[in-house]
């Protein structure tokens, strides 16, 4: 099988909801990260054969946002681009599709990743097509409807998390402890400057004022304690729930991208091989417990790689909810000391279309820093799916 290399891996800072990146669209963020990627590797834009980008919240964004990103980033007009939607796994699915394109010989050099502006998801008015002739009309939040709502059971993703708490007997205390740990790990990573290498600064217009350059993640709350988290009310099941705003991932804006090509092509161009992509898998599960999707996906990806879980040195697993991450860890029985060593989505944020690539970016850089040999990245996805990918240095 053809060895595929990641030669550059970058991301924007992650903005909080209606925060620093509120003036920017998903395409703005995607274009910024693609420009940053090309600058890092000093590769001419014309050398890129295709761009594949994940984005979940595309309502009102215009045709094929990935194509908009490609052209705004300076890729030639004859370079194709496609937008991918696997909900939270979109960014990682984009990477998987890029690998497949290169292995099939359909492309030589591909930029893959994801972008999302949850801050700018529009409201929808159903029924207006035929005219609202009398009475009231209601607006529907496209962020919730298209990104956070289970289409099969007609309830919020938070209820799927509550279902996991019930099924696996995971207490509120364990969830809060996990969330506080994620915040502490992220705070330590930021203080040590461990995200600097992977982040591309983003310039944000401020009208007549000079642009603001955002260089750091906006979401982390380093002062968070378990005692503070215990004071929060359940967000989705008020009477007896355990999932809160503090032990769940947040609403965010951001983008991430990787540059992929064959290992021999990278060496020919004098580009570094940060990691090789070994295998990947997507798996379906019951939508009502979508959070366990990574279990089957990880098992399949590891089997395809010929690895055992014990061989893996580092794991990046998206923290959609603390209870979801705990349930996956419980089922896979992985070593928690290897997982999200610099914090996860509960602390850093979860821009849903970008997170799949964001965890790859963070994993690659931490593998480099530690001299780790084998890595695993995985996410769950709304609608009952999981995706996983194995990397090797």
Stretch-by-stretch model annotation:
Residues 1-61, 65-73, 80, 160-172, ...:
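Conserved active-site "lid/cap" helical segment
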Residues 1-24, 139, 225-292, 296, ...:
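Condensing-enzyme catalytic core mediating Claisen C-C bond formation in acyl metabolism
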Residues 11-12, 23-27, 31, 40, ...:
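N-terminal extracellular/periplasmic Venus flytrap/periplasmic-binding protein-like
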Residues 46-54, 80-85, 110-115, 176-181, ...:
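Beta-strand segments within the central parallel beta-sheet cores of soluble alpha/beta enzyme folds
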Residues 55-109, 152-156, 223-250, 331-358, ...:
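Conserved catalytic cysteine-centered active-site region
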Residues 86-116, 159, 165-194, 257-264, ...:
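Active-site-proximal alpha-helical scaffold in enzymes
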Residues 109-163:
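Flexible glycine-/small-residue-enriched beta->alpha junction loops
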Residues 160-162, 198, 206, 278-347:
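Active-site pocket-lining segment
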């Amino acid at each position: 099988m053809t060895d595929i290399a990641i030669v550059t891996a970058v991301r924007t800072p992650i903005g909080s909801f209606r925060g620093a990146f509120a003036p920017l669209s998903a395409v703005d963020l995607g274009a910024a990260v693609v420009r940053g990627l090309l600058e890092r590797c000093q590769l001419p834009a014309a050398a890129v054969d295709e761009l594949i980008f994940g984005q979940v919240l595309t309502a009102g964004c215009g045709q094929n946002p990935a194509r908009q990103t490609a052209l705004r980033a300076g890729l030639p007009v004859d370079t194709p681009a496609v937008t991918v939607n696997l909900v939270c796994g979109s960014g990682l699915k984009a990477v998987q599709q890029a690998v497949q394109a290169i292995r099939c010989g359909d492309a030589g050099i591909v930029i893959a990743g994801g972008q999302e502006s949850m801050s700018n998801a529009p409201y929808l008015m159903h029924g207006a097509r035929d005219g609202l002739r009398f009475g009231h009309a209601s607006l529907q939040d496209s962020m919730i409807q298209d990104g956070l709502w289970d289409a099969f059971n007609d309830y919020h993703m938070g209820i799927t998390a509550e279902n996991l708490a019930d099924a696996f007997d995971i207490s509120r205390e364990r969830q809060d402890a996990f969330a506080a740990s994620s915040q502490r790990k992220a705070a330590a990573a930021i203080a040590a400057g461990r995200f600097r290498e992977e982040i591309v600064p983003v310039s944000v217009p401020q009208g007549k004022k000079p642009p603001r350059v955002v260089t750091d993640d906006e979401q982390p709350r380093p002062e968070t304690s378990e005692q503070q988290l215990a004071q929060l009310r359940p967000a989705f099941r008020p009477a007896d729930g355990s999932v809160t705003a503090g032990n769940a991932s947040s609403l965010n804006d951001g983008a991430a991208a990787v540059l992929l090509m064959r290992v021999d092509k990278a060496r020919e161009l004098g580009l570094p091989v940060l990691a090789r992509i070994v295998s990947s898998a997507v798996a379906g599960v019951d939508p009502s417990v979508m959070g366990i999707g990574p279990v089957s996906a990880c098992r399949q990806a590891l089997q395809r790689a010929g690895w055992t879980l014990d061989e893996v040195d580092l794991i990046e697993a998206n923290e959609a909810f603390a209870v979801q991450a705990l349930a996956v860890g419980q089922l896979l029985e992985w070593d928690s000391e290897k997982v999200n060593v610099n914090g996860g989505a509960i602390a850093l944020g979860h821009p849903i279309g970008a997170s799949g690539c964001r965890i790859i970016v963070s994993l690659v850089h931490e593998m480099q820093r530690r001299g780790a040999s084998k890595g695993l990245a995985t996410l769950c996805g709304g609608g009952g799916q999981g995706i996983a990918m194995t990397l090797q240095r």
